[in-house]
Amino acid sequence: MPSTGTLVIIFAIVLILCIMLLFFYKTVEAGKPSVLPPPIPPPTPPPSKKKYDHNEYMEKTDLEPEVKKNHRKWANEAEHLISSSVKGLENLDEAAFLANHKGHGFRTFEHAKSLFKEFLKKY
């Protein structure tokens, strides 16, 4: 039977080998890609917007037949009125405008023109 000192030395060697094996196992596991979290996928691009088709829109609407028939003519007339309003605004007399629009909150003639142009851009 081996002495107690020999058993302690054998036990210490086995313990050291187990600890080394444990550290080796941990380092090998850390290097495996299966242990790492999965990579974040790239963001998906938003779906492309469908181009506006006016004829398709008019088919889906529940407007009266007369309105469906004449809407393009009315839209052209409205565009003409807006463009003539802009041209008229360019040729407008400043003194006459300010006299007719006293109390409407316009600071200057240029202020009124800029507000009107902003309004036309919105609508």
From Swiss-Prot:
Region (Disordered): 32-53
Record GO cellular component, one term: virion component
Lipid biosynthesis recorded as keyword: no
Recorded superkingdom: Viruses
Inducing or repressing factors: Expressed in the late phase of the viral replicative cycle.
Key words, A-Z: Host membrane, Late protein, Membrane, Transmembrane, Transmembrane helix, Virion
Chain intervals with Pro residues compositional bias: 35-47
Family membership: Belongs to the asfivirus CP123L family.
Protein name: Uncharacterized protein CP123L
Native organism: African swine fever virus (isolate Tick/Malawi/Lil 20-1/1983) (ASFV)
Organism lineage string: Viruses, Varidnaviria, Bamfordvirae, Nucleocytoviricota, Pokkesviricetes
